[in-house]
């Protein structure tokens, strides 16, 4: 089932998400719905707060990137209760967009290496270092679980330059090709 994506201004996007227990109701169905919603909106990642749920669940599907990055062929994973334990490597700037910020794309600096823990869809524990593009996508999505958005990493000048677009979203005027839930 395709779910509406919550757009900038929705309070759930600024709340810290909670870890869930292994018996969380309908978890597999939720994950399937998140993948379907994300794919319909042409996203590569989706965090549960973006569909209105303040829980620590993220889906990432990087198969679309596999022409340029062959290591992501058939890469499709769910991350349950993910946490970043440590960051490393160098800070790399790359343009990011977000399904909750339609029409906004800005360069964001992030570490290119992270140490993460999470449960997979089978509730198996993982503790690993991740680097490169996947590390960036994870940081972007995991930010949502901490009540942050990529615009929080921008300079005051860049924030000022997108103020009009953010204001339009607050008025319920998000322009995109997928189903959204605005505050108006």
Curated annotation (Swiss-Prot):
Q: What InterPro entries has UniProt attached to this entry?
A: Peptide_deformylase, Peptide_deformylase_sf
Alphabetically sorted, this entry's keywords are: Hydrolase, Iron, Metal-binding, Protein biosynthesis
EC number(s) recorded for this UniProt protein: 3.5.1.88
Keyword Zinc set for record: no
Cofactor binding annotation: Binds 1 Fe(2+) ion.
CDD domains given in the database record: Pep_deformylase
Q: Which residues bind Fe cation?
A: 98, 140, 144
Q: Which EC class heads this enzyme's classification?
A: hydrolase
Alphabetical list of Pfam families matching this protein: Pep_deformylase
Q: Does the keyword Metal-binding apply?
A: yes
Q: Which GO terms describe its molecular function?
A: metal ion binding; peptide deformylase activity
Q: Where is the active site?
A: 141
**Catalyses which reaction?**
N-terminal N-formyl-L-methionyl-[peptide] + H2O = N-terminal L-methionyl-[peptide] + formate
GO:BP terms for this protein?
A: co-translational protein modification; translation
Q: Known HAMAP family for this protein?
A: Pep_deformylase (MF_00163)
NCBIfam families noted in UniProt: pept_deformyl, PRK00150.1-3
Function, please? Removes the formyl group from the N-terminal Met of newly synthesized proteins. Requires at least a dipeptide for an efficient rate of reaction. N-terminal L-methionine is a prerequisite for activity but the enzyme has broad specificity at other positions.
Which protein family is named in the record? Belongs to the polypeptide deformylase family.
Official protein name in the record: Peptide deformylase
């Amino acid at each position: 089932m395709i779910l509406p994506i919550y757009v900038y201004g929705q309070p759930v996007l600024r709340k810290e998400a909670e870890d869930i227990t292994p018996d969380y109701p309908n978890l597999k169905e939720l994950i399937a719905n998140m993948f379907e919603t994300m794919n319909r909106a042409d996203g590569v990642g989706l965090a549960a707060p973006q569909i209105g749920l303040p829980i620590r669940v993220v889906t990432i599907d990087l198969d679309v990137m596999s022409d340029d990055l062959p290591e992501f062929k058939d890469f499709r994973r769910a991350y349950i209760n993910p946490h970043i334990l440590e960051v490393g490597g160098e800070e790399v700037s790359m343009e990011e967009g977000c399904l909750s910020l339609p029409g906004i794309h800005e360069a964001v600096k992030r570490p290119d290496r992270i140490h993460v823990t999470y449960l997979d869809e089978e509730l198996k524990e993982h503790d690993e270092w991740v680097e490169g593009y996947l590390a960036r996508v994870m940081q972007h999505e995991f930010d949502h679980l901490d009540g942050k958005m990529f615009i929080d990493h921008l300079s005051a000048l860049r924030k000022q330059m997108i103020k009009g677009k953010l204001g339009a979203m607050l008025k319920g005027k998000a322009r995109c090709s997928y189903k959204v839930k605005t505050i108006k």
